[in-house]
UniProtKB/Swiss-Prot annotation:
This is Cysteine protease ATG4. Interacts with ATG8. GO terms for cellular component: cytoplasm. Pfam families: Peptidase_C54. It is an enzyme of class 3 (hydrolase). The active site is at 174 (nucleophile), 369, 371. Cysteine protease that plays a key role in autophagy by mediating both proteolytic activation and delipidation of ATG8 family proteins. The protease activity is required for proteolytic activation of ATG8 family proteins: cleaves the C-terminal amino acid of ATG8 proteins to reveal a C-terminal glycine. Exposure of the glycine at the C-terminus is essential for ATG8 proteins conjugation to phosphatidylethanolamine (PE) and insertion to membranes, which is necessary for autophagy. In addition to the protease activity, also mediates delipidation of PE-conjugated ATG8 proteins.
């Protein structure tokens, strides 16, 4: 009973986060203070790794404490830790462990409906199940799917960015990290397929390691935070400053083009065209943004340098769906986008804190949180079994979907022309069901009228500010709550 109470207290402590901003390092780390720094608050991302590990030790939670602090904690607990280790290895304790970790990591119920995770449905509804075994299997499948998504968080200890003293992106880099996660999933789907899962009992896939290397924290890594900031200068990106979804999408467009020109004769590091769907080039406003089929074809032709008419395509749709909150009429539409097989989720989150939303269950939005601070790691292909644990999360977090910030961007990955045609068909149907207020529409060309129209819109771009509130500098010329910003 004492052990159970202790476990419950530890689990409750690990699962008590009430917001997406679990910032455990509130300092910016200049290059001059890189050496000798120590943080006493550095929780692991996974409850599994901090409590129920084979080498059980309480001081693992304080991995960056000073050596003297570690010795004190370890000596105080080594006696009962050895005893508990024996209990943990037992079958009854293992079942208890699974029950505790399952509730903490998923916090979902079969009564809440099915979960849609990046185009895949995990059918956990009670009426879909024939027994406890089926429920456990479905939950396990969901957990494995969630765990296999690539997590990219704040890092500290990397080389200073350009001429600045910043060796960490703590408190300002959450949108950049969220966007890295979305692009990483696109690469994962492209190279390994949507059904790929990360396993602990098999050798890691080379393609998977290649993807992680692209997102390292140095100028040598193609899609690093260093190179994103360089590519996004024209859209206001700067070291230590916050950025909005629209500028982030355009930055990826620039970075991909720069990388393509740099590797003109070699293999493309981002083997897909990028199409940012955000209104006319001359700035004309009005209605929902339009996925123009001719523009998509043009992007593919440019990417292949005219060699083939179609290539894999990454679509990014930045939107502002309200003023201080998302207009509720858009919530069902956002939910439906996760049912698209092409779904890459949403760049967004609570006001002031960008996250990467990858799934929904009714009114819940499951997300990966970039706000945990982790030390820089160097993933190389030379290591036989590289440690990639910091790129995955065993704890699934969720927030109410109607609480997300109205400034967001939706991503889709289309593998080929048939996949794009399927996306267009689904998007058109979704627009037809929107009661006149679609997220976006589809048209063959810019000269054709939009299939579905919505109210006039106006506004300025907004940026994520990583505090408790989001400063929204929106101008609502029409004075209508349903109006949203056309980017």
């Amino acid at each position: 009973m004492v052990l159970k109470d202790l476990c419950d207290r530890i689990v409750a402590a690990k699962c008590s986060s009430k917001s997406s901003t679990e910032i455990v390092d509130n300092t910016q780390v200049p290059a001059s203070s890189k050496a000798g720094s120590s943080d006493s608050k550095f929780p692991k991302a996974s409850l599994w790794s901090t409590f129920f590990t084979s080498g059980f030790s309480v001081d693992e939670t304080y991995s960056e404490s000073s050596s003297s602090e570690k010795k004190t904690v370890h000596s105080r607990n080594s006696g009962w830790a050895a005893a508990v280790r024996k209990v943990v290895s037992g079958g009854s304790m293992r079942r208890f462990q699974e029950r505790v970790l399952g509730s903490c990591r998923t916090d979902v119920s079969s009564s809440d409906g099915d979960i849609w995770l990046l185009g895949v449905c995990h059918k956990i509804s009670q009426h879909e199940s024939t027994g406890d075994v089926d429920i456990r299997n479905v939950f396990a499948a969901f957990e494995q799917d969630f765990f296999s998504r690539i997590l990219i968080t704040y890092r500290k200890g990397f080389d200073a960015i350009e001429d600045s003293k910043y060796t960490s992106d703590v408190n300002w880099g959450c949108m950049l990290r969220s966007s890295q996660m979305l692009v990483a999933q696109a690469l994962l789907f492209h190279k390994l397929g949507r059904s790929w899962r990360k396993t602990v009992d098999k050798p890691v896939d080379k393609e998977y390691i290649d993807i992680l290397q692209l997102f390292g924290d140095s100028e040598a890594a193609a899609f690093s935070i260093h190179n994103l900031l360089q590519a996004g200068k024209g859209y206001g990106l700067a070291v230590g400053s916050w950025v909005g979804p629209y500028a982030m999408c355009r930055t990826w467009e620039v970075l991909a083009r720069n990388q393509r020109e740099k590797n003109e004769q070699g293999e493309q590091l981002l083997p897909m065209a990028i199409y940012v769907v955000s209104g006319d080039e001359d700035g004309e406003r009005g209605g929902a943004p339009v996925v123009c089929i001719e523009d998509a074809c043009k992007r593919c032709l440019e990417f292949s340098r005219g060699l083939v008419p179609w290539t894999p395509l990454l679509l990014l749709v930045p939107l502002v769906l309200g003023l201080d909150k998302v207009n509720l009429r858009y919530i069902p539409l956002l939910q439906s986008t996760f049912k698209f097989p092409q779904s890459l989720g949403i760049l967004g989150g609570k006001p002031g804190a960008s996250t990467y939303i990858i799934g929904v269950q009714n009114d819940k939005a499951f997300y990966l949180d970039p706000h945990e601070v982790k030390p820089v790691v160097n993933i190389t292909g030379d290591t036989q079994e590289p440690n990639t644990s910091s790129y995955h999360c065993n704890i699934s977090r969720h927030m109410p979907l109607d609480s997300i910030d109205p400034s967001l961007a939706i991503g889709f990955y289309c593998r080929d022309k048939d996949d794009f045609d399927d996306f267009c068909s689904r998007a058109t149907k979704l627009a037809e069901e929107s009661n006149g207020a679609p997220l976006f529409t589809v048209a063959q060309s810019r000269s054709l009228p939009m299939q579905v129209t919505s109210n006039s819109v106006s506004g300025d771009d907004t940026r994520f500010e990583e505090d408790d509130s989001l400063s929204m500098n929106l101008v609502n010329d029409a004075g209508n709550e349903d109006d949203w910003q056309f980017l």
